[in-house]
Amino acid sequence: MTRPSVKLLTTLLACLMEMLNFRVSSGKDPDLLSSSSSSMSPSDFLDKLMGRTSGYDARIRPNFKGPPVNVTCNIFINSFGSVTETTMDYRVNIFLRQKWNDPRLAYSEYPDSSLDLDPSMLDSIWKPDLFFANEKGANFHDVTTDNKLLRIFKDGTVLYSIRLTLILSCPMDLKNFPMDVQTCTMQLESFGYTMNDLIFEWLDKGPVQVADGLTLPQFLIRDEKDLGYCTKHYNTGKFTCIEVKFHLERQMGYYLIQMYIPSLLIVILSWVSFWINMDAAPARVALGITTVLTMTTQSSGSRASLPKVSYVKAIDIWMAVCLLFVFAALLEYAGVNFVSRQQKEFLRLKRRQRRTQKEEDLQDGRLHFSSYNTTTCVKDGAVVKNTQVNQIQQPSILKNTETNRKKFVDRAKRIDTISRAAFPLAFLIFNVFYWITYKIIRHESARKD
């Protein structure tokens, strides 16, 4: 072999080796990639990806000085706890999931399409500074270990999931209580990064998921949930914010059993006095006072679990009207008693008039004696017999007295008779207007809103 041929062969062999080295270093050859990855341990790979020797800095956001980082969020609701009217808040247990792309974490030297890392690695990477704007209290879960998930994909996409229990503020409008529909909001906001650096968005598919069979004691969670943006403007800048609104429809079965039906029965019980004899004053008065006091206690109990708001609620109107009907039934007997006693007052007035007339006759010197059909009159010291005088006959007095007594008693009985029909009819009319207004008109209006 000639010298030029050997030189040419050597040059070709060197070029081939250079090409092979380039393909190995660039990771484009699958076979060489497999052999290289098998020789690299996971610990070495993680150190190379985000360790001290990688040059990765968790203090700097992805695309620094470039476009903002888009973070897609979705939540999974494990449980929806108690909704408290007095403090106007609600408790919820969720999985919060955030996903964003960090080009510095993209890899090709490892065969797996994604890496599930220990939660302790969260301190080694950059994370969004998300917080809940309407949060009143929160806590993490660490039984039996930290309930956190970190997953990194080949293209640098990072999935961060965490389990939280939150107490969130929920301003309530209780005008239609207990037939109200409440709208409770959850707001996710960036604390320090403005919209030039960070933007939150809802996941396109299934942004808010609810566990199967999730129920609340007093509320029904509607299927529709309003998703939107709630961008906040402060003196320090414009901050990204997304929100979800939960529509909670109150189930009034508890209040129907504990408040409406007992108060209804108390009102009906107060009407029993209309069938009791008006002469049985102790029985009717005791029944009236008992129902009034019971209704007052019931009304106070209905407000014990509610905040001291300045407006009138639906339950307040119901309790006030029931108390009014019970008190009116007690006043009705007072009126009946007063009318029935007018006959005694009338007789007392007649006796007073006759006594006054006799006194006037004595002062005028006239005195009448009636005996054995002979009338004797003493006038000016002289006795005059057979004087014609208008005498009040005793049978006539008794007859007039009985007539007057019967007239007043009939009036009192008529009041009781009218009340037996008027009170139930008035209460029925009130119920028709009350339930149509609150259960149909206002309730449907709240559902549409």
Swiss-Prot record:
The regions listed as transmembrane in this protein's record are 256-276, 283-302, 314-334, 421-441
Q: Which cysteines are joined by disulfide bonds?
A: C170-C184, C230-C241
User: Which residues of the sequence carry a binding annotation for glycine 3?
Assistant: T236
List the Extracellular topological domains: 28-255, 303-313, 442-449
Membrane topology, as annotated, equals: Multi-pass membrane protein
In the UniProt record, the signal sequence range is 1-27
Source domain of life: Eukaryota
Q: Which GO terms describe its cellular component?
A: cell projection; chloride channel complex; postsynaptic membrane
Q: Which residues bind strychnine?
A: R97
Main subcellular localisation: membrane
Q: What happens when the gene is disrupted?
A: GLRA2 morpholino knockdown leads to axon hyperbranching of spinal motor neurons at 24 hpf.
Q: Which residues bind glycine 2?
A: R97, S161
The record places the following residue ranges in the Cytoplasmic compartment, namely: 277-282, 335-420
Please list the residues that bind Zn(2+). Answer: E224, D226, H247
MF terms from GO for this chain are: chloride channel activity; glycine binding; metal ion binding; transmembrane signaling receptor activity; transmitter-gated monoatomic ion channel activity
**CDD domains found in the cross-reference section:** LGIC_ECD_GlyR_alpha, LGIC_TM_GlyR_alpha
How is the activity of this protein regulated? Channel opening is triggered by extracellular glycine. Channel opening is also triggered by taurine and beta-alanine. Inhibited by strychnine.
Subcellular locations according to the entry? Postsynaptic cell membrane; Synapse; Cell membrane; Cell projection
Q: Tell me which residues are glycosylated.
A: N70
Q: Which residues bind glycine 1?
A: R97, S161, T236
What is the catalytic activity of this protein? chloride(in) = chloride(out)
- Tell me more from the record: The alpha subunit binds strychnine.
| UniProt-listed PANTHER family | NEUROTRANSMITTER GATED ION CHANNEL
Similarity comment: family membership: Belongs to the ligand-gated ion channel (TC 1.A.9) family.
Q: What does this protein do?
A: Subunit of heteromeric glycine-gated chloride channels. Plays a role in synaptic plasticity. Contributes to the generation of inhibitory postsynaptic currents, and is involved in the down-regulation of neuronal excitability.
Q: By what name is this protein known? A: Glycine receptor subunit alpha-2
Q: Which organism is it from?
A: Danio rerio
